[in-house]
Structure formats: C-alpha cells, structure tokens
C-alpha cells in the first residue's frame, strides 16, 4: 500500500477495536497520525490500543455512540490525550439479524438505527464544531453497498446505511466553506466479526453478488480511507466511494 502522510494529524476511529475500523486505525498510525480508538467493548479496545502502541501514539476510549452524552464524554477524554480532532472515522455499526421486513423484531430495528445512524449523527454533531473552529477536518463515514442497493433479509441494516450516505451528502455541503471534507465509503462485505451476526445463507448471497468473486480485504478499505483523510483529497466532499468489487458501479 502507498504511504499517506498524516504526520501531526489527530484522528478518532469509532468501532476501532476490530475489523475495518482496526485496519483503518493501524494505517493511520503507520501514516504518522495520533489515533484515539472509540469502542463500546472496553476490554477489546484497551487490548487493541496496547497492541498498536508500538506503531505510534494511540489511546482507547470506551463509548456508546448511540448515547449523545457518552459521545460528549468521549470527546472530553480524547482532548486530554491529543490536541483537537483533525480526522473522524464513523465506522461503528452492527448488522443485526436476518429476517423479512414483516417479521423483523422492532427492538432489533431500533437498536440498528440507534447505532448505525444515530451514532453517526451523535459523533458528527459533537466533533464538527471542533473542526469548524480549526477551519480544517476530514470526515469519512463507513456506509455499505447495502445502503445503495438494499439487501433482502437486511432491511434495517440497508436503511441505516442509506441514511449514512444521505447524511454525508448533506454535511459535505454544510461544511464545504470550512475546509472540511466529508465523504463516505460503501464497502462490500469483508470477513470480520460482523459475519457472526449473519446467517450463512446471507453471507453466500453477498459473495455471489461480487463480480470480483471474493470478499473485501479490510486493508483495501483502510487504503481508500487514508487517502480521503489526507491533504491530497483537497477538493472532493459529499461523495460516495465504492468498494464493492464491481457489484455497484454508480
């Protein structure tokens, strides 16, 4: 992977203890950034931060992104560790169970919305004022190809990720005058812990939709995100970057 220069930049990665979030955090560290990992799993996020500490300056914060007060407290903790927040990666999310919409448990629907889109809103609402004050920022929201196309048996997940795309487009326009770039990625499925929440039938459905014939590698997602966070991305904002292996070509 090409090296991206993020020296002297500070970054927050939600859901940074594992999966795509971990790969992003690791590449940002390797690129010179100081990184704060936000995750609801206290044990795992602390273990991950310890493991990454040899690569650079990294901290762990336990946070529930679906709770606005928890996010506000996370910002307070993070600002004690590093000066400001230049980069925000909204990656935390869950897939939820696979079921037809008419059979979908309302409590699971609400939980998915609370984490996948309300969590993004809470982080954006809390962090963007810091970036506005500094007249600089790079925000990348992690959506999904499901948010563009909709996956059967995953209406809640698909709807929540479509909302992430929409909030990216709106906020990109709102922050364009503040030297803040807001973009999102729409990855196809990658082999991460989120697969544990899915039926094998659904996993095979997703694989069968990818013309490349394989799942996304988390390092491939991290590479695109790192570029979006860099000074090289000086113009593009409010955009959707596809990582679906040819499934979605718009």
Language-model-detected regions and their locations in the chain:
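Short C-terminal tail/terminal secondary-structure segment
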Residues: 2-5, 95-98, 149, 237-250
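Canonical Rossmann dinucleotide-binding motif of NAD(H)/NADP(H)-dependent dehydrogenases/reductases
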Residues: 4-36
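C-terminal substrate-recognition "lid" of short-chain dehydrogenase/reductases
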Residues: 82, 124, 132, 136, ...
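Substrate-binding pocket helix/loop in short-chain dehydrogenase/reductase
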Residues: 99-101, 108-110, 195, 206
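Active-site helix of classical SDR
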Residues: 124, 160, 168
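Alpha-helical segment proximal to the catalytic Tyr-Lys
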Residues: 129, 173-177, 234
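Residue(s) in the substrate-gating loop at a strand-loop-helix junction
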Residues: 144
């Amino acid at each position: 992977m090409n090296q991206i220069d993020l020296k002297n930049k500070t970054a927050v990665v939600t859901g940074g203890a594992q999966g795509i979030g971990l790969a992003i955090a690791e590449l940002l560290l390797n690129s010179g950034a100081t990184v704060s990992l936000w995750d609801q799993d206290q044990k795992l996020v602390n273990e991950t931060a310890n493991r990454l500490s040899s690569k650079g300056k990294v901290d762990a914060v336990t946070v529930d992104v679906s709770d606005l007060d928890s996010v506000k407290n996370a910002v307070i903790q993070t600002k004690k560790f590093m000066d400001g927040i230049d980069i925000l990666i909204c990656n935390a999310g869950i897939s939820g169970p696979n079921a037809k919409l008419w059979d979908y448990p309302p409590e699971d629907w609400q939980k998915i919305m609370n984490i996948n889109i309300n969590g993004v809103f809470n982080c954006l609402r809390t962090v963007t004022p810091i970036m506005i004050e500094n007249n600089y920022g790079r925000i990348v929201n992690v959506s999904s190809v499901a948010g563009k196309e909709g996956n059967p048996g995953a209406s809640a997940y698909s709807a929540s990720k479509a909302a992430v795309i929409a909030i990216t487009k709106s906020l990109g326009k709102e922050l364009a005058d503040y030297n803040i770039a807001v973009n999102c990625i729409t990855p196809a499925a990658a082999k991460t812990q989120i697969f544990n929440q899915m039926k094998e039938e659904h996993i095979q459905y997703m694989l069968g939709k990818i013309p490349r014939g394989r799942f996304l590698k988390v390092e491939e997602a991290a590479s695109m995100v790192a570029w979006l966070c860099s000074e090289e991305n000086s113009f593009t904002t409010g955009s959707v970057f596809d990582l679906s292996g040819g499934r979605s070509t718009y």
